């Protein structure tokens, strides 16, 4: 490993430091951070997608009802629960599309004109869970993400917002929603992914896009 000697710095005269020149080069370009290595560890989507595909008839029905691509729904099922309708996360996200009753579940209830929030048993019901997941994607697309023009960029924005919230995504562009959407529309899909990898506070955000592409390729 190369050695660098620091001189002219108080307290560091003659100090010899070993550095990884590859990491230094990366840092000079964009910052040396493992946060950007969102493809590791590799994710094999084959089995999760196979399990998620068994729910495709429901996904197609929900997609038609809410104007959401059923393949996107299937990909989210594969990523979120691996096709397990009884999955419950540590943060109490429930079911095939891992919905939280108090957040996304409540938002869907409000869209439907209902009070309260869905029960655990309701969220474990495959048809109800997928229907509410599709409804939530519609809420994101027609609400905070409205105005995104590129279909692929919109797809990426949807899954990042689904996983980590639309506000967190938009704030990486601007605190003003309209300005954020305008900046997003200046990017193609690859540029959007690069922006998310470099600027989103959640390391899992770019990895979700990576998993989305793996899942879509496995269908």
Swiss-Prot record:
What GO terms describe the biological role, i.e. biological process, of this protein? cell wall macromolecule catabolic process; cell wall organization; peptidoglycan metabolic process
Q: Any idea which UniProt keywords this protein has?
A: Cell wall biogenesis/degradation, Lyase
Main enzyme class:
lyase
Respond yes or no to whether keyword Lyase is given for this record.
Answer: yes
Key word Nucleus present: no
Q: What are the record's GO terms for cellular component?
A: cell outer membrane
One Pfam short name = SLT
Recorded hits in InterPro entries, A to Z, give: EmtA, Lysozyme-like_dom_sf, Transglyc_AS, Transglycosylase_SLT_dom_1
The protein's superkingdom reads Bacteria
Tell me what reaction this enzyme catalyses. Answer: Endolytic cleavage of the (1->4)-beta-glycosidic linkage between N-acetylmuramic acid (MurNAc) and N-acetylglucosamine (GlcNAc) residues in peptidoglycan with concomitant formation of a 1,6-anhydrobond in the MurNAc residue
Q: Which CDD domains match?
A: LT_MltC_MltE (cd16893)
What are the EC numbers?
A: 4.2.2.n2
Q: Which GO terms describe its molecular function?
A: lytic endotransglycosylase activity
Record-linked PANTHER family:
ENDO-TYPE MEMBRANE-BOUND LYTIC MUREIN TRANSGLYCOSYLASE A, SOLUBLE LYTIC MUREIN TRANSGLYCOSYLASE-RELATED
What protein family does this chain belong to? Belongs to the transglycosylase Slt family.
Function, as annotated: Murein-degrading enzyme. May play a role in recycling of muropeptides during cell elongation and/or cell division (Potential).
Name the record gives this protein: Endo-type membrane-bound lytic murein transglycosylase A-like protein
Q: Which organism is it from?
A: Shigella flexneri
Starting at the broadest rank, the lineage of the source organism is: Bacteria, Pseudomonadati, Pseudomonadota, Gammaproteobacteria, Enterobacterales
